[in-house]
Structure formats: C-alpha cells, structure tokens
Amino acid sequence: MLKKLFFILSKEDKNFLFFLLVFSVFISFIETFAISLVMPFITLASDFSYFDRNKYLISLKEYLNIPVFEIIVYFGVGLIVFYVFRALLNAYYFHLLARFSKGRYHAIAYKVFSKFLNINYEKFTQKNQSEILKSITGEVYNLSTMISSFLLLMSEIFVVLLLYALMLLINYKITLFLSIFMVLNAFILVKILSPIIKKAGVRREEAMKNFFEILNTNLNNFKFIKLKTKEDGVLSLFKAQSEAFSKANITNESVAAVPRIYLEGIGFCVLVFIVVFLVLKNESDISGILSTISIFVLALYRLMPSANRIITSYHDLLYYHSSLDIIYQNLRQEEENLGEEKLSFNQELKICNLSFGYEGKKYLFKNLNLNIKKGEKIAFIGESGCGKSTLVDLIIGLLKPKEGQILIDEQELNANNTKNYRQKIGYIPQNIYLFNDSIAKNITFGDAVDEEKLNRVIKQANLEHFIKNLPQGVQTKVGDGGSNLSGGQKQRIAIARALYLEPEMLVLDEATSALDTQSEAKIMDEIYKISKDKTMIIIAHRLSTITQCDKVYRLEHGKLKEEK
C-alpha cells in the first residue's frame, strides 16, 4: 500500500507527510505527559504530608516559601494551562491533517486528469468516459479519505504505545492483563469485521462504476429516452445501482460504529475490574491507590477512542483500497512524450507503405501509399467502418503507424515534431461539442481572445449576420452542447473554431452529414471559398460535398482507389 501511495504523492507531499508523522509523535508525547501529570497532582492534593516526607518537595516548599495549598493551586492552574495548550495543539494538528488529506484531492485529481490528457490518442479511445469521470471525481476523493485514515491510524498508534509504556511503569501486572484482554478483543473485532468491509468496498466500487456508466449513457441519449418514453426503465437501472452503492456505504458506516460501542462496553468493564482489584489489594489504604486509579481512568478514557479510531481507520484502508489501486494504475499509464521540433509543410505529404491496426485487432491497412500536395483538396469515401476516420487520424498525427511512415516535405513525422505538426491542422468533426459558454469562448477554445482574428473568422464562417442580431453578440451563451443553436449555427461556429487557429490544413470528418442538402451545399461552398490556399482533407458520405475536390479516393478492404 505504501509503495503505491508514495508513487502517487509528489516529493513535497511526501516531505509534508513525514512532517505530520513526526508531529504526531510529538503530540503523542504531549498526550502522555499530560496524563502522567494527573497522578502526582491527585497524590499531592489528597495528602499534604508528602511535602514533609519527600526531600524534593521539602526543597521546593522551602524555595517557594508559600503554604502547601498555594503550591497545589498553582500546580492545578499550571495543569489547566497545559491541558488547554494540549487541546490547541491537537486542534492545529487535526487542521494540518485535514489540509493535507483533503488538499490531496485537488493535487491528485489534477495529476489524474493531466495523465488522461497526455496519454496517446489510441489509448484514450479505448477508455470508458464514465470510468474517467469516476476516477477523477469519486476515486480521488476516496483516496484523500484513505490518506486521512492512514495518518490518523499512525497518530493513534503512537499515542497508544506511549500511554501503554506509562501504564507499564505504574503497574505492569494490571497493564499486561489489560493488554492481553484488549488485544484479544480487538483481534476478534478485526477478524469478524474486515471481510465484511472488504466485500462492501468491492460492491461500492462496482456500483459506483455502473452508476457513472448509467448517468453518462442516458444523459447523452436524453432525446431518445423522451421519444421512446423509456424514463421508467432508465430510472429502474439507476435505482438498482444507486441502492447498491448506498447499501455498501450503509454496511461500512454500520460496521464502523461497532468497534466504538463494543470497546466502550469492554472499557467500562475493565475499569471496574481495575478499581475492584486495587481496592481488594489495598483494603487498609484506599487513599494510597486513588492516584493509581485516577491515572488508569484517564489513560483508559484516552485509549478507548484511540483503539476505536485505529480499528475504524484500518477498516477505511480496506474499504477504499480499490480506489488506491485504480488511481495507481491510472497514473502508471504511459504518456505521449512529444518534442518541440519544428516541421514545415510547404510541398507535399507522403504516406509510404503504411500499415495500421488497433491494439489487439487485425490491421485495417497494409502497405498503403498516398501523396497529398500542399494546397490540394482531397476526399475519402467508402462504406461505414472501412477506416476513413482512422486513416485521417493517422494523417493528422493522432495515431501512429504500426509499419511504414508519413513524410512531410521528406521529413518523417515522429514524436519530436508531431506537436508542431498538429498545430498546423484545423479539425471539424462530425459530432460538434460546444460547451456552455459564450460564442467567443467556443470559437477561441481556451486561447486568448484576439478581437481582430475573432471578427475575421466570424465573417469567414458567415456568422456575422447571425451574431449581430443577438442582444449580447459574441458573448451570447450557446447552452450545454450548443442547445440554444441550430445545426447550421453550430456547424459555422465549429468552422470558425478551426479557422481561428489559422491552420495550413483543414480536415472535415463528415462535418456536414447532420445538415440538410441545401445547408450542406451552402456551408461547403463557404469552406471551399475560405480555404483556397489551404490543404483540405474531407471524409464524406454525400458525393455532392466533394465536387470541388482535386482528388477523390475510395477506401475499400484496406486499399485506396482513386476515383477522380
């Protein structure tokens, strides 16, 4: 567990974790010292004669030159001040504990999200979107809870060990008996409850995975659900997983309460036993054992919550262990390491003996060859599933050939120059996603807003008239997924987004297939008009959209056949 946790945490986090562990040891000494002070205080307060019998107390009384009761009062006040200091120190420690454990949610979520953004495209296409969302949200939060439980476990172990040492010094016989009795009961608790917690943790992880899957799938098919009136069926699926998730958490919470209830009862019985044992042993001098009884009462008062926290924290480690495994596996994914080498595209792009197949599947292409000249407009046609989009993904550098190479002006496309090459490409997909922000933000897509460039691409994409009639202009919100816009308006925003990057190559992946023939023809005319000097690659189903292309290739059985 520690190996995986240290892999996930940064160097700064590990250093702070070490500091917290050292601080917890210091807190443990303070706790033990605070309890140890109670015994002499009660002893002296119950019998002033100690100041006449103990040479150190005699010297102290002579040095202070004040009545004994005043010494006891000052001792009591000092004890109160020390306990207040102890309480403040504990509060500060738990603040640091919460800041570290819950603060890791941000740091680890950022690392996991960054990892997903930086894995290669082929690996990403094999991921389940709901799994990614679950990892970044639920599993990372669970891991932060697990870290908190781990630190609390270590802190309480230190407290228990030091208090145990103190109790051994006071009365080793009672302490040894107490140890055997408590360890035996704790062992029974752990053996009985741990399997229940583990099974609940597995059920929680499985239910959570299905929970996110159902949400993701059905929210993306809302129109179909409404049309087919499938609400009841969807709710039934959601209810089953939501209940499974709740039941797993109920089991965990219920089992977590058992150690406290059980140990409180056992602790009370042990306390009564200690008092009875000491009274029977010292029948003639009850006042002499008052301090011993007091110290054991205080020690047990502090040990019972510690024992409960240790068992509960251990159960949390078991319950959330799957979250640690999931985050660890996510962060171990190999990243796409791209260099900053420049790549010029002034003459032509060559595909030489290219072969490709997705991992674990047969090759889609074998020994494919193709030349695309700078400024040329080409189209790929073919049956659905023949590999048109995959071929384009290879051409634009998202996928890497298994065999063969892609040459840009006779320079091989590789990890060193792919990043620069991708920046030369404007991409308009079939399924356009607009986020719930302004038109301007959707066009610039995270880049700084250049008003001159923004106005130019709005004009090029024929959005000028539409935006002028909007009360808020380019600051108008488009709605989630562009729900406030028509299909044609979304398409034009996607075109403006692609043009804003000032690309040298424009790629349309069935970008107008969702439009009617008239709208499609109009938008394609606009695209051809504004892309005179750009290289264009088009994937199309309708031949009417590619009449102005220089070349048309049909992809069939992994082979390209020129049709124009």
Curated annotation (Swiss-Prot):
Keyword rRNA processing: no
Enzyme Commission numbers on file: 7.5.2.5
Boundaries of every ABC transmembrane type-1 domain copy: 17-319
Catalytic activity: ATP + H2O + lipopolysaccharideSide 1 = ADP + phosphate + lipopolysaccharideSide 2
Example GO biological process: protein N-linked glycosylation via asparagine
Pathway(s) annotated for this protein in UniProt: Protein modification; protein glycosylation
GO cellular component: plasma membrane
Effect of residue 302 to A: Abolishes translocation of lipid-linked oligosaccharide
Subunit text: Homodimer; domain-swapped. Helices that arise in transmembrane regions 4 and 5 from one subunit cross over and contact the nucleotide-binding domain from the other subunit.
Family the UniProt entry places it in: Belongs to the ABC transporter superfamily.
PANTHER family for the chain: ATP-BINDING CASSETTE SUB-FAMILY B (PTHR24221), ATP-BINDING CASSETTE SUB-FAMILY B MEMBER 6 (PTHR24221:SF654)
Entry protein name: Protein glycosylation K
Annotated organism of origin: Campylobacter jejuni subsp. jejuni serotype O:2 (strain ATCC 700819 / NCTC 11168)
Name of the encoding gene: pglK
